[in-house]
Amino acid sequence: MEGKKAPRGKKNTNNMEVEDISKIQENAKHTIKYKYTTFDELKEQGEYNFFGIVYDASFPQEESSTSESDKKKNVTKYFCILKLIDQTTNCLTNPNNFNENVIYLIIKSTEKENIPFVHNIGDIIRVYRGFYAPKKKRNIYVNVCKDNKIKGSWCLYSTNNNSSEPYSCSNKQFSVETQDKQIIENTKTWVKNYLNIDKSLKYPLQVNLINRINDGNDNDLLVHVVKKIELNDQIVLFIQDASDGCELHTYKYYNFIQENDIIRVRSYKVFDNNNLIINEFGNILVLPPYSNCYKSLINDMTKKLKQIK
């Protein structure tokens, strides 16, 4: 009696059907849904998908200069600028020419909620369809349009938890693919190791708090939040570093800041009684406790207290 033939598309005793091989090859193509580009691979002008790590960020702003067509349509545009690094382009890989290599991500939209409000240095951003157009700086532009007609999109991920879900996103219909989860997990591990290294963060405009008045330049601070008070429409942060202390008055947008946080105050100005407010294009970003900058400031303040005692 003749044995039964193996069904088409299933394994024979000695070989595999061509149809099965084709299916495996086709499935392999779909395992990687998106191609992501690292910053050292950005050479030619064009559209790219990528992951970046937030090194610095401005607060979402209304764009002052709009086109004549926008004025006629009464269209308001918003934007923010993020400085990004990755495993291939950062303060350690480019110590002598970092500012020439850091990525400037400019995100624009007609809806303010589509502009990212970054909370922490070291947060991860995923960008789809960012347009790389290098000029004097390495700029990438993302336009998030009104009425869900999205030319580009972004998602923000915190490095302070183990979740692969974003805490903020420009597109409510975002997806997190299997490849994304692996990239996010690996990037979080890298960020924690990187920020723990000395000189992994360099902010040339940073000054000591005691020099906040003497220097009229547009400078930055790295300070410890001693106390936080919530008022009607604002919060008051009592801040200090190893040199001095004062008050920082700001809006409730920054209510995510907690007592004992170490924060980067990006662009400030002094007002009544030597207190501070944030400049128009300034921002406040929280430093993660595993970062070297965080630990260094705590050590400096501890030494200062011991000297006083």
PLM features per residue range, with description:
Residues 1-309:
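Single-stranded nucleic acid-binding proteins centered on OB/S1-type folds
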